[in-house]
């Protein structure tokens, strides 16, 4: 199965989504399709053995829409006809390439399906065919298509306004007819085209209602123009105002939709176009597409990091807010990883390129956000059911309104009955209902991405809102995931520094995690070099021994010391480290006990505060771990967790989550290790912390790349704000239609007022969703919690 995000053109209203969804899902080989009107894209999963991109594009066209084609020029180093032909053949085999043309000057033009084909793949295919090329600028991308659509709509709006303006003046009826005809079949063609596409697929959208209303007004006015009666009015001007106002609403809707989709655009703009790459002995500026794996790239102050890689030399402070949501610069030194798209605040470094193109972290984030914005949340099902019957219902209501007015309220008054019927058609707004959920999800997931929280789907966002039970894995989630020296307990007369440095002198010869913890602590306490150790030996599970400064030193467990015949009575006066669930390392010199060191996997500094916030919000907090009960309870007590599941094997974790769900709880599992995978898979809401394994990340629907637990309350905050906004959108859309349609049927509204109200309802939904962009800017954690 293959997943693609395909850009779609000619979706003019939210009702188009259901039509295209059904058309794509009926195509053999397509497992699922999720269309997003606001993002103008479709997320499609299909079987490559059954169908292909050409068949999918053909089905999209048959449904009345278009799949645009991007153009990528590739400039060959040598303009040789035979080599160019071989390169063209190689390009045609690249996934996502629709066709290739060889220009007269030897330039290769690749025509691409809009699925994000990487220019590096195209260049690599050409190189494989013996033709080195330089990728040119991509034409017809997302930004180009969005600008083109907006400009076309603006031209149509201006033309409509220019045609309507003369109709507002006193004119001869036949001149009004000519101007009205130009208006109806000029700018009005915008609605006719969309309505016709819907009719061909037996679906009705807002544009069909507008076309029907406008056509009825036009035909009535045309009839009156050529009928020798003086008592009837012409409504060409009303028709023009109706079309112009709706076009204005459409244009404003496009502007607002562009703002709603700004998160992905901002992420894409983080990728610099060029970079300083080493070629020979010098660094030259090259397009990012020409960077290869292991190339050395120079990063200067104020520049964005062009690729994922490892620092080879130099030091810098990098702003990784695009990944973590936190703008505090992170110091980087040789050996540290840097992420493409992050901003170098200060310093200069040389980076060895590693992950390029679609393999980079930035590209993966963009794909996750795209997927989340296209996936439908469960709350969308209600809107889909209503929208399916909305337009036929409005047409029926309009027909009934006409009959009641023509036969009962104003008998034989065709003018009044027809205008009231058109009022009903004009005021109804299925788009507000169709936009309510996807715009909320788009803005909410985009805002979350800006804050370093990645939702993979709308369902995950909704489940996070519903979660009332949070289960933490211990190691690497509540704790730092690595042992650290926490206690220095010297015997009487022994200096703490002496105890630590003596143990570290011996442990520096070992690569055991406990040894690294001791050595790291000693180096933090003093810059002085550690004395060398001789005759070093390691006893598995017991400890280490050797000679330091001519004295025999032993560092290990009490049991081992007793086996070696060393008197451990002095340890009785020291704190009980075992009782605190810590590993005890006893240190002796020349057979005399000097003291003990306590080592433990320390809790994260923010863990206790986060748990307190979750509990204050009414969420039940659990900790699940494979550790012994004593260790688990010690950590739980430190962070404030009352419910502990200890000594749980990896294969038992999923069953533990299922038991909690069976009690009626909506469970959010937070983990990061490979043994969390089964539990993450069965939880209602699965959160993977940064640094987790690929398997864990695949099993989780929500990612916190920074690994910062403080993002968890913010996650719930954003999910709640998003679902609340969606519900308010749906309530407004339903309320508007339930009130406006009956009012219009009373005949008290002018068609222009109806058109204004209809446009305003859609724009209102979009603007209300855009308020989510401010979510999380203030330090508001769980604002729904009532103050006592």
Give the ranges of each region predicted by the language model.
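P-type ATPase nucleotide-binding
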Residues: 485-619, 629, 641-657
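Conserved cytosolic catalytic loops of P-type ATPases
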Residues: 31-37, 41-46, 95-112, 265-359, ...
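Flexible metal-binding regulatory segments at protein termini and peripheral loops
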Residues: 1-171, 282, 363, 367-375, ...
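Juxtamembrane coupling segments of multi-pass membrane pumps/enzymes
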Residues: 73, 77, 85-89, 236-301, ...
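Conserved catalytic phosphorylation-site environment of P-type ATPases
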Residues: 323, 382, 419, 429-506, ...
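Membrane-embedded alpha-helical bundles of multi-pass transporters
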Residues: 200, 219, 223, 227, ...
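Transmembrane helix-loop-helix hairpins at the membrane interface
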Residues: 22, 31, 35, 145-274, ...
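Conserved ATP-binding TGD loop and adjacent catalytic N/P-domain core of P-type ATPases
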Residues: 85, 548-550, 583, 589-728, ...
């Amino acid at each position: 199965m293959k997943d693609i995000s395909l850009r779609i053109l000619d979706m003019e209203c939210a009702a188009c989504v259901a039509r295209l969804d059904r058309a794509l899902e009926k195509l053999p080989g397509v497992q699922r399709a999720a269309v997003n009107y606001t993002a103008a894209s479709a997320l499609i999963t299909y079987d490559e053995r059954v169908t292909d991109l050409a068949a999918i594009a053909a089905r999209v066209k048959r449904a009345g829409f278009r799949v645009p084609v991007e153009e990528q020029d590739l400039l060959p180093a040598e303009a040789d006809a035979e080599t160019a032909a071989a390169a063209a053949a190689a390009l045609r085999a690249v996934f996502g390439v629709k066709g290739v043309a060889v220009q007269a000057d030897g330039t290769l033009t690749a025509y691409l399906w809009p699925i994000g084909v990487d220019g590096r793949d195209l260049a690599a295919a050409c190189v494989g065919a013996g033709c080195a090329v330089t990728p040119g600028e991509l034409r017809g991308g997302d930004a180009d298509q969005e600008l083109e659509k907006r400009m076309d709509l603006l031209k149509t709006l201006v033309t409509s306004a220019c045609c309507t303006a003369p109709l507002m003046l006193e004119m001869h009826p036949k001149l009004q007819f000519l101007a009205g005809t130009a208006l109806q079949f000029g700018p009005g063609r915008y609605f006719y085209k969309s309505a016709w596409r819907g009719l061909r697929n037996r679906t009705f959208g807002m544009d069909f209602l507008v076309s029907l209303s406008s056509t009825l007004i036009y035909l009535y006015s045309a009839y009156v123009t050529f009928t020798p009666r003086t008592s009837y009015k012409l409504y060409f001007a009303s028709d023009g105002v109706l079309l112009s106002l709706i076009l204005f609403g459409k244009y404003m809707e496009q502007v607002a939709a562009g703002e709603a989709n700004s998160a992905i655009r901002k992420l894409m703009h983080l990728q610099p176009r060029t970079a300083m790459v080493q070629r020979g002995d010098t660094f030259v500026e090259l397009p990012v597409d020409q960077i290869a794996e292991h190339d050395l790239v120079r990063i200067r102050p104020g520049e964005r990091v062009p690729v994922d890689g490892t620092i080879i030399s130099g030091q810098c402070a990098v702003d990784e807010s695009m990944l973590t949501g936190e703008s505090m610069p992170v110091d980087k030194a040789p050996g540290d990883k840097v992420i493409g798209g992050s901003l170098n605040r200060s310093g200069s470094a040389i980076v060895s390129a590693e992950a390029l193109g679609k393999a980079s972290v930035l590209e993966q984030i963009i794909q996750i956000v795209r997927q989340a914005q296209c996936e439908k949340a469960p709350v969308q099902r209600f809107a889909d059911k209503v929208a399916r019957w909305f337009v036929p219902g409005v047409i029926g209501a309009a027909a009934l309104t006409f009959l009641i007015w023509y036969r009962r309220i104003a008998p034989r008054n065709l003018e009044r009955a027809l205008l009231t019927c058109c009022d009903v058609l004009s005021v109804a707004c299925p788009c507000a209902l169709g936009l309510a959920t996807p715009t909320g999800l788009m803005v909410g997931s985009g805002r979350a991405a800006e804050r370093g929280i990645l939702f993979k789907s709308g369902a995950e966002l909704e489940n996070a809102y519903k979660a009332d039970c949070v289960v933490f894995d211990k190691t690497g989630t509540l704790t730092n995931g690595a042992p650290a020296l926490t206690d220095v307990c010297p015997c009487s007369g022994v200096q703490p520094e002496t105890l630590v440095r003596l143990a570290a002198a011996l442990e520096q010869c070992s690569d055991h995690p406990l040894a690294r913890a001791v050595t790291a602590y000693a180096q933090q306490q003093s810059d002085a070099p550690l004395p060398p150790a001789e005759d070093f030996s390691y006893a598995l599970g017991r400890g280490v021994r050797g000679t330091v400064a001519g004295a025999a030193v032993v560092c290990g467990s009490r049991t081992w010391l007793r086996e070696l015949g060393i008197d451990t009575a002095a340890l009785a006066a020291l704190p009980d480290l075992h009782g605190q669930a810590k590993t005890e390392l006893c240190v002796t010199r020349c057979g005399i006990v000097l003291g003990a060191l306590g080592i433990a996997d320390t809790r994260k500094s923010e863990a206790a505060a986060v748990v307190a916030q979750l509990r204050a919000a009414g969420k039940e907090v659990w900790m699940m771990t494979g550790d012994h009960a004593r260790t688990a309870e010690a950590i739980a007590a430190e962070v404030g967790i009352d419910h502990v599941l200890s000594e749980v094997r990896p294969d038992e974790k999923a069953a533990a989550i299922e038991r909690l769900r069976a009690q009626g709880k909506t469970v959010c599992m937070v983990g990061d290790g490979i043994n969390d995978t089964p539990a993450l898979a069965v939880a209602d809401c699965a959160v993977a912390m940064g640094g987790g394994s690929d398997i864990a990340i695949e099993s989780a629907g929500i990612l916190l790349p920074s690994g910062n637990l403080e993002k968890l309350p913010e996650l719930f905050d954003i999910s709640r704000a998003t679902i609340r906004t969606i519900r308010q959108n749906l309530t407004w859309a339903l309320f508007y239609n339930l009130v406006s349609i009956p009012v219009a049927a009373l005949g008290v509204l002018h068609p222009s007022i109806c058109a204004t109200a209809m446009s305003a309802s859609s724009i209102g939904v979009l603007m209300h969703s855009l308020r989510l962009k401010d979510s999380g800017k203030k330090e508001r954690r769980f604002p729904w919690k009532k103050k006592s």
